């Protein structure tokens, strides 16, 4: 019976463990790099992220909308995303998977077994513009 050779995270000199949070951050940043991704997370996660950004000293969490399971040699990823209107969702998903797998495997040495995407919303042009031309309804 053959035994698997140790991966880059385990050697005769010791073992390296990588926290879920580290993989979560790598995944979040790699997903955001893909053209066609507007944001990560569902509605509630994005709302909390927007509130968090307004608090002095806080920063946007790169792990928002990202869930990972990390084992000794493998990782599985679940992502919730918002895509840009007009982009092919299938092409964006393919690019996200490719970028996430490349980033995680390249930076950690973990084998990514799956990258599951849930597209929760589509960002429409003009969604970010506040309509200040309309007068307030209540004075």
Give the positions of each predicted feature.
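Soluble periplasmic/extracytoplasmic beta-strand elements of cell-envelope proteins
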Residues: 17, 26-28, 67-69, 76-82, ...
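Short, charged, intrinsically disordered terminal tails
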Residues: 1-8, 123-139
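Short acidic amphipathic segments
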Residues: 31-40, 110
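Short, non-transmembrane amphipathic alpha-helical segments
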Residues: 27, 89-108, 112
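Intrinsically disordered, low-complexity glycine/proline-rich and charged
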Residues: 105-125
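Short edge beta-strands and adjacent turn/loop segments
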Residues: 44-80, 124
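Short hinge/gating elements
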Residues: 7-16
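A short interface-forming secondary-structure element
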Residues: 72-94
């Amino acid at each position: 019976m053959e035994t698997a050779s140790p991966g880059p995270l385990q050697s005769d000199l010791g073992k390296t463990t990588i926290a879920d949070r580290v993989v979560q951050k790598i995944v979040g940043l790699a997903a955001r790099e893909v053209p066609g991704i507007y944001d990560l997370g569902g509605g509630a996660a994005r709302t909390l992220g927007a509130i968090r950004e307004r608090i002095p000293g806080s920063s946007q969490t790169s792990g928002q909308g990202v869930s990972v399971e990390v084992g000794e040699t493998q990782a599985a990823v679940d992502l919730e995303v918002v895509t840009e209107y007009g982009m092919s969702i299938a092409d964006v998903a393919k690019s996200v998977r490719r970028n996430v797998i490349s980033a995680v495997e390249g930076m950690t040495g973990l084998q990514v077994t799956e990258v599951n995407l849930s597209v929760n919303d589509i960002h429409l042009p003009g969604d970010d513009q506040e309509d200040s031309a309309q007068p307030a309804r209540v004075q």
